[in-house]
From Swiss-Prot:
Name the UniProt record assigns to this protein: Ribosomal RNA small subunit methyltransferase G
Binding site for S-adenosyl-L-methionine: G89, L94, I140, E141, R154
NCBIfam families xrefs: rsmG_gidB
One Pfam family here: GidB
Function: Specifically methylates the N7 position of guanine in position 527 of 16S rRNA.
Species the sequence originates in: Bordetella avium (strain 197N)
Length: 224
């Protein structure tokens, strides 16, 4: 089967995005990332995994956006070390599937309350041969504490609800990480007392002219 020009262009743009983000993603990993996007487009026609349907915007707002958090997480978790990560409210696996592809030493679980979305993630674990990727159909507040190094969310809830519902899955010394657009000052002020913002890290998403940041949160001193 011949390769379409738009596929070649997407591959070139992905390679450039990885370079600009400082990611050493190999050819096989980049191919899996593009296959993941193609499968999301295909499933989206039937199962409505995401409101974004344009392939161009999916590449930027889903794939590149998710890739932008990899290096910050690598720095926090120490490169090459195993880590346990929960992606809460993962939807179709963003950023969890992307993390599983580019960081095979991390054990990634994508948690979502919508069964068709976790079914898609489970399918991707098999299709893309990702033994480190798992899907969990559940409400995060009903899941037994998981003792994670990082619990991350991209479009799950306010910081208050994220900390209240998912914070118990973070091991002592671990981190809650929220992917946000503009710095959510009001949400930060509304954080539960048990959690505090450690730092706010600006993100630069390739080809996206919009504000993005990571909110890093740890337990307040004296809390378990």
């Amino acid at each position: 089967m011949s390769t379409m020009p738009e596929d070649i262009a997407a591959a070139q743009r992905l390679e450039q995005a990885c370079q600009s983000l400082g990611l050493a993603a190999g050819a096989e990993q980049q191919e899996k990332l593009l296959r993941y996007m193609a499968q999301m487009q295909r499933w989206n026609r039937t199962y409505n995994l995401t409101a974004i349907r344009d392939p161009e915007q999916m590449l930027i707002q889903h794939l590149f956006d998710s890739l932008s958090v990899v290096q910050p997480l690598v720095r926090a978790l120490q490169a090459g070390q195993p880590a346990k990560v929960y992606d809460v409210g993962s939807g179709g696996g963003l950023p969890g599937v992307v993390l599983a592809i580019v960081q095979p030493e991390w054990d990634i679980t994508c948690v979502d309350a919508v069964e068709k979305k976790t079914a898609f993630v489970q399918q991707m674990a098999g299709t893309l041969m990702l033994p480190n990727l798992h899907a969990m159909h559940a409400r995060i507040e009903r899941v037994a504490p998981a003792d994670c190094d990082v619990v991350i969310s991209r479009a799950f809830a306010s910081l208050h609800d994220f900390a209240n519902l998912a914070g118990r899955h973070v091991r002592p010394g671990g981190t809650l990480v929220a992917m946000k657009g503009k710095v959510p000052a009001e949400e930060i002020e509304g954080l539960p007392a048990a959690w505090q913002v450690e730092r706010i890290e600006p993100l630069q998403v390739p080809e996206l002219d919009a504000e993005r940041c990571l909110i890093w949160m740890r337990r307040s001193q004296g809390t378990l």
